[in-house]
Amino acid sequence: MAPQYEHGVLFYHQHSGLNKIHEGLGEVTVALTQLCKRFTIQLSENEGDIEKYCQRIQDQDNREGIDVLFILGGDGTVNELINGVLKYNLNLPVGIIPGGTFNDFAKTLNLSTKAGPASQDLLLASPQKYDVMKVEDQYVLNFAGIGLMVQNAENVQGQSKDLFGKLSYIMSTLKTLSNPKPFNYTLDIDGRTYTGETSMLLFANGRFIGGGKIPLMEMSPSDGELNTFIFNNYSMSILKDIFSLRDSMTWSEISDNIDHIPSRHVHVKTEPPMRVDIDGEIALDTPVDIEIIPQAIELLTVEPGQAKDN
């Protein structure tokens, strides 16, 4: 096939989630060099390196002629590149190659869940515009969560999530659900106020969270809306189904236990102050402002059914 791009850059972390990173890079490179006339691989050694590279592209007026960016990693790593692209107004399409435990947004893009097949999928992909969440000053592709999601992440101790993958995460979930910690919330959503007690709040752009699919067909990461979910304290069995990757659920099964509020801007206050999980990274505390930025980024997307492992 003829290359579609002049110069592509692939970013990766040494600890990207692939067991044998250099073998994985070789497989990915075979595919991406078919897409790009010139192809550069860039190791990110420290947090913030990817954003600095994006800043350099802007500062140098993109003198290297880069016209596509790729990222190998999980959702948190992907967000590093998304933040760099948006903060420095690069206006470049991004190709995502899964390299973490769940890679939720890669599923939204109809990509395979493994790096090698996903890089082959990108040969069939085309850029499509997607919304992006903004949580305080951070851009986020997929979700922000408060309560049980943070408890769950903190229960996955040390390296266990990387070593044992989904099994470790699910076992942690079962532990978390047996000991939920309720909190009080005040949500100011587009001029309306909601108050109450819950064990979990979820703010979602994508349709996959922690490997499971939110069973709401009309959800779309390109509709200009943020999806706010307030979980009933008595819906522990429902939460277990969602976290345990049960794909057969329908919204009618859970709508009595979860309030869904389409929104654009949300101000979140909790009592006591709570940690906030942003695509698997716990970096903020309430209160926080969350908004949706419509059509903010171009991501390489495959038509449904074309992915190698579908």
Positions of PLM-derived features:
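ATP/NTP phosphate-donor binding region
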Residues: 1-69, 79, 84, 306-310
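Short Gly/Thr/Asp-enriched flexible loops that form oxyanion-binding sites at enzyme active sites
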Residues: 76-92
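Glycine-rich beta-strand-to-loop/alpha-helix junction loops that act as flexible
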Residues: 14, 72-74, 99
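ATP/nucleoside-binding phosphotransfer catalytic cores, i.e., glycine-rich phosphate-binding loops
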Residues: 21, 189, 195, 220, ...
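Catalytic core of DAGKc-family lipid kinases
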Residues: 35, 87-199
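Glycine-rich phosphate/pyrophosphate-binding beta-alpha loops
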Residues: 145, 202-215, 282
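Gly/Ser/Thr-rich active-site loops/lids in small-molecule metabolic enzymes
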Residues: 160-168, 217-237
